[in-house]
């Protein structure tokens, strides 16, 4: 998931690649990166709506899973969640939202492609798994975002595939 700076994701992706090679004896496929995408022709609209809907989604996750609570601390097998909770308590929901927004691909088609290009430069080739309906986005807005992505972003991503990128 696109949920924190991509430079911080690189070690876990490299660990996955190493483990894949070790256990399968072949090169790993490109990682599948899930993302919340909001694409709009106008940068200010994309920034406003993208951040609003992503914030709505994150608020629901924080509330539903009680991610910022202390209940993971003494639960065996949930140490990673406990560590995440400590970080979230330190940076707060606002800090988490800023990091999440910075990691996601939302904006104009050019901005979305720029976000994907930055990822490619850090992690290498990947498969994109965008989600267009989240955080209460009305269906018509989600469809418009998806169609714009399909018309202007996807053809470029397909060229990257031919070139060995995404």
Model-found features: residue ranges?
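Glycine- and other small-residue-rich loops at beta-strand/loop junctions that grip anionic moieties
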Residues: 1-2, 35
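Glycine-rich, proline-tolerant flexible connector loops at the mouths of alpha/beta enzymes
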Residues: 3-6, 130-142
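An alpha-helical appendage that flanks or caps ligand/catalytic pockets
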Residues: 7-125, 158-166
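C-terminal helical cap(s) of enzyme catalytic domains, especially alpha/beta-barrels
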Residues: 11-16, 138-158
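Short, charged/polar low-complexity linear motifs in solvent-exposed/disordered segments
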Residues: 65-67, 131-132, 147
């Amino acid at each position: 998931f696109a949920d924190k700076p991509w430079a911080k994701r690189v070690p876990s992706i490299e660990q996955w690649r190493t483990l894949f090679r070790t256990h399968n004896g072949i090169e790993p496929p490109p990682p599948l990166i899930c993302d919340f995408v909001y694409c709009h022709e106008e940068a200010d609209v994309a920034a406003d709506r993208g951040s609003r809907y992503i914030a709505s989604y994150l608020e629901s996750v924080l509330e539903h899973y009680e991610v910022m609570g202390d209940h993971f601390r003494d639960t065996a097998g949930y140490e990673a969640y406990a560590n995440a909770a400590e970080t979230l308590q330190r940076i707060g929901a606002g800090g988490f939202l800023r990091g999440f927004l910075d990691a996601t691909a939302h904006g104009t088609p050019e901005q979305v492609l720029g976000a994907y290009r930055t990822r490619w430069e850090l992690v290498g080739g990947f498969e994109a798994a965008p989600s267009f309906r989240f955080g209460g986005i009305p269906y018509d807005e989600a469809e418009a975002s998806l169609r714009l992505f399909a018309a202007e972003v996807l053809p470029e991503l397909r060229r990257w595939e031919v070139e060995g990128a995404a």
